Amino acid sequence: GESMTDQETPERAHVTADDIEAANDLIDFIEACPSMFHTAATIMAELDEAGFTYLPENAAWDIEPGGRYYTQRNTSSVVAFKVGEDLAATWGEDGVAGDYHFQLTASHSDSPTFKVKAVPELDGAGETLRLNTEAYGGMIDYTWFDRPLALAGRVLVREGDRIESRLLATEREVAIIPSLAIHMNRGVNEGFAPNRAVDLCPLISAGDLKQGDFDALIADELDVELEQILGRDLFLVNRQDARIWGWADEFISTPKLDDLACAYTSLQAFLGAENAHDVSVFCCFDNEEVGSETKQGAMSTFLADALRRINGSLGFDDSYHRALAASMLVSCDNAHAVHPNHAEKCDARNQVVLNGGIVIKEAANQHYCTDAFSRAVFQAICDDTDVPTQAFANKSDMAGGSTLGNLSNMQASMHAVDVGLPQLAMHSSYETGGVRDVMYAIRALTAFYERNLTINGAESVEL
């Protein structure tokens, strides 16, 4: 086949010490984020450390130019923003927007996994005890077999007249989904479609635990009484260690690469960039893997509510829609790299490779929000920053996926581009990406935040 774009493939750079440092920092971030609730908590801790002010949604917001703030919803979605010191709500006679606009990135905090049901236990053969789970998102089921599994999420605990949310991440492996031996399933290698209600029930005890023990063990983990537990959102976590590997240190493999790689790189870009003339916004939404149609998802009012409140607190009530028209969103969600054994699954020309640079995704059916205008803006920023880019489009006889850019645009419409890091095995319990692409993404997104865009409709933009 041909190369991934109509441009010549550039000479590949070797992995540098900076690349490895960035990839190791990503691994540390992922290991701190075993659930969407931990992802939000980890992000908010970084924002606190960087001097951001927390603004609860149920409190009044007092926002000033030069300030740095964040809010959260459901303890699983975060919107953070920095107000430029030189922000001004002025428009010229020709209608070109002045300084007041938003430049945003959006990623998501969740990954496909299995959620523990309200009544959590199932008896198994003999004296075994299993967990009663259901699928969260579209995972590759067979990748969950024979892996060390922990539990992570949140538990709602009653303390007198108060109910509070507690984070939980077991420090030990507590479950495994065992394969059926090939001697009992001779046709397994000819094709196996696991039944999630039968084959994918995790084993948690060979006989020492009984019905009712699960919540008691959760109570012990949290050092509370069993009767204090009123609710829980707990998910299975693959406890395989993340690692950088390969003779040339080219690869990073880890659970949850989709989409914590984008959450991490966009957060680092947001924290490291400086722009005195705009409102820079970082978004990390929950529930992308199950459609985003929740109060904390990209399709909710969360982002639009925050932007309106920023606008109102700054005293720019009449300028909100004009600001949106001058704004741009970079939707950050990973992209499919061409598979080494299945090149036929990708478009012959619009295919991408690991360590080839940040991916710009486009689809005629509008499942990605990229158009010629937004592609041109992001491409120019990457060109000026010497960050390589790759063009991705689905093969024309394959449906492909979608992401959160167009969904968030339903509530707050603006120019938008879909980008991501290339990876293999998307929605596996253990995914693989390229080490160099982590730093490429940080550099590209930092440049986006630092470039003060002056957008005139869809006709022109000053970089």
Regions found by a protein language model. Give the residues of each.
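N-terminal hydrophobic/helix-forming segments and targeting peptides
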Residues: 1-463
